[in-house]
Amino acid sequence: MAQTKRSRDESEKEEVVVKADVESSDVDHSFKSLNLSQPTMRAIEKMGFSKMTPVQARTIPPLMAGRDVLGAAKTGSGKTLAFLLPTIELLHSLKFKPRNGTGVIIITPTRELALQIFGVVRELMEFHSQTFGIVIGGANRRQEAEKLMKGVNLLVATPGRLLDHLQNTKGFIFKNLKALVIDEADRILEIGFEDEMRQIIKILPNEDRQSMLFSATQTTKVEDLSRISLRPGPLFINVVSEHDSSTADGLEQGYVVCESDKRFLLLFSFLKRNQKKKIIVFLSSCNSVKYYAELLNYIDLPVLELHGKQKQQKRTNTFFEFCNAERGILICTDVAARGLDIPAVDWIIQFDPPDDPRDYIHRVGRTARGTNGKGKSLMFLIPNELGFLRYLKAAKVPLNEYEFPTNKIANVQSQLEKLIKSNYYLHQTAKDGYRSYLQAYASHSLKTVYQIDKLDLAKVAKSYGFPVPPKVNITIGASGKTPTVVKKRKTHKH
C-alpha cells in the first residue's frame, strides 16, 4: 500500500497540463480527423455535428490513445461527447458482446443528468451492435437487474443505485470493465456521495481500466477522488484558461436591483412580455417552485416545474416536454442546474440568488451551450445582496446592470393578495414557499452577503401575496436544533 502511495505521489509530478486556447490553430476540429468507426461517424452526421468544441478537440485524441484524463471543463462545453466517443469506440474495437457484461460505466450525480447522457448514448450507438442501459435511483430496481443480467455493455448510472447493483445484483458482470467515466465529480461529492464513490472504486476492477474524471470546479475532494480513481500521471486538460471568463462566451449576463416586495411583480411582468421565448427560472427551494408554478398557472401564465419533491417519472416527463417545446417557461430548483442540455434557452432568470459563484456558473451554463451558443441571463438582487457582485467579479464573471422602467411593471399586488386570501390551497402553498425561502436564505453559506436579519420580512411576505408576514417556524443551521419563529419583521431566537 505504501508503495503505491509513493509511486503515485512521484508520478503526479509527471502530470501533463494542457492549456486549451480556444482559437488554437494546431488542433484539427473536424470529427473526420478522428478516424472514427463507420457506425459512430454515421451517428455523428445524423446528429448534425461536423466540428468539435475546444474541449472535444483537446480531450478525444488522448482518450482514444488510452490516456487517463482529468478534465476541467465548464458546463456547456461539449464534454458529454468528449467522453462518449472514445468509450463507444473502445467497445466497438474490442467487439464487446452482451455476454462480456459491462465494459464502460459512466457515473453522474443526478437522475436527470443520467437520462440526458443516456439520450446521447442512444443516438451515438444507433448503428452499433453493443448494448447500453441506465440505472438510477427512483427507477424500477428489478427491471434494471434483469437487464444487467442479460449484459449491458455501456452503463450510465447514479452513484447510489450503481453501488446497490454492484453489491447485490447476482449475474451483473463487470469484471471486464475497460473504462470508467466520472462526470460532474465536484457535484457528486457536493451532494454527499463521497463514501459511495470510494466503495464503488474499491469494487470495480482497475487492472487495465482507462478512467476519466470531469469537473467544472477543482476542489481538494475532487483531487482526492481523482487520486484513487485515475492511474498515476493522468493528462490534465484545462479548457478554462487563466484569462478566460468562467461562463460560456456567447452569454450576455446582467442583474437587476429590486426591493423584495417588487420581485414577483417584476418577474411576472418580464415573463408576460417574453411568452414567446424559452426561459428557465431558478428558485432556492422546492416549496417556492411549487407556489410560483401554481400561482402563475392559475393566473394563466403557463409554466412547467421541476424540483426534487416530484416523482422521477414526473421529472423526466417535464424535462423532455420542456426540451421539445419551441417556447415556454420552466421554474426549477438547482437539481436541474447541472449539465442538463436543454437546447436553445433564451433566458436564465436567477430569481433567488445562488449560494456562491460556482452555483451561478452552473445555473447559467444552461444557455449559450456548444460551439455557437447565444443566450441571456438575469439575476435578481435586493439592495442588501449587492456584495455578491464582488464574488462574481473575483470568479471572472462579467455582469452588466439592467434597469426596468417602473411604469412597465404590472402592479398586480392587490389582485395577488386577494387571490391568496380567498384561495385556501394557494394560501397554504404560499405560506410553505415563504417559509422555505427564509429557511434557504438562513442556510446560505455567504453569510456576509445573505444576512437573514437584514431581510425586510414585510416586503418578502408581499412577494408571496401576504399583506402581513404569516407566522412560520424555521430552523437555522445544519443541525436543525435552533427553532426560530419569524413573526412580523422580527426574528426571535429561543
From Swiss-Prot:
**Location of the Helicase C-terminal domain:** 250-420
- Write out the residue ranges of the motif DEAD box: 183-186
Q: Which CDD domains match?
A: DEADc_DDX18, SF2_C_DEAD
The Gene Ontology biological process annotation of the record reads:
maturation of LSU-rRNA from tricistronic rRNA transcript (SSU-rRNA, 5.8S rRNA, LSU-rRNA); maturation of SSU-rRNA from tricistronic rRNA transcript (SSU-rRNA, 5.8S rRNA, LSU-rRNA); snoRNA release from pre-rRNA
Please report the stretch or stretches of sequence annotated as the Helicase ATP-binding domain.
Answer: 60-236
Q: Where in the cell is it found?
A: Nucleus, Nucleolus
Protein name, as recorded: ATP-dependent RNA helicase HAS1
Question: Which species is the source of this protein?
Answer: Candida glabrata (strain ATCC 2001 / BCRC 20586 / JCM 3761 / NBRC 0622 / NRRL Y-65 / CBS 138) (Yeast)
Q: Which gene encodes it?
A: HAS1
